[in-house]
A protein has these predicted regions:
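Membrane-integral, polyisoprenol-dependent glycosyltransferases
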Residues: 2-170
């Protein structure tokens, strides 16, 4: 016989968990639908954006995902992780602006859900919602997330590292 918790506390915990999942799914869906369809409409314009996409393209051509190349010559200025993610995107969606920028759109979704969950944990559900909305509507992060540069992924990893540090500390 399986015993399940009953009463107001169990109902609150269940409702609270499902509202967090529902909120996270809603944030992810709105972020995706408001962002992803227009990623490939503009050509790559920034020097870094062009180089990252070219490095990813050359990873696909050479099969070398460890050593970044631009013009088939070694390019050690940037780490290979982001270009490897772009190459994976290009393998699925083809070589182009959309595939080069899609990883940052996915990073945007993860960042917004992470900000919501952290705000919810630190303060409450409403604070998490407002925090994600404020960040999601901010100009500079949106410009970065619409590009094919390494900064959004780098920022997400730093943010996750700081959160993990404080989680393990307490």
């Amino acid at each position: 016989m399986v015993h399940t918790a009953t009463g107001p506390v169990a109902a609150l915990l269940t409702r609270d968990r499902s509202s967090g999942l529902r909120d996270s799914a809603l944030i992810a869906a709105v972020a995706a639908l408001s962002f992803i369809p227009w990623l490939g409409r503009l050509h790559l314009f920034d020097w870094d954006e062009i180089n990252f996409a070219e490095g990813a393209r050359e990873m696909l051509l050479t099969g070398n995902y460890r050593d970044v190349q631009i013009g088939f010559e070694a390019f050690a200025e940037k780490p290979p992780l982001f270009m490897g993610v772009q190459a994976f995107s290009m393998r699925i969606f083809g070589i182009g602006e959309f595939a080069a920028r899609l990883p940052n759109a996915i990073v945007r979704i993860i960042t917004l859900v992470g900000i919501y969950l952290l705000g919810r944990q630190l303060v409450d559900r409403r604070f998490g919602q407002w925090w994600a909305l404020a960040y999601g509507g901010s100009l500079l992060p949106n410009l970065h997330f619409r590009s094919g540069i390494i900064d959004p992924l780098f920022n997400l990893l730093i943010f996750a590292g700081i959160v993990a540090r404080f989680e393990f500390q307490h």
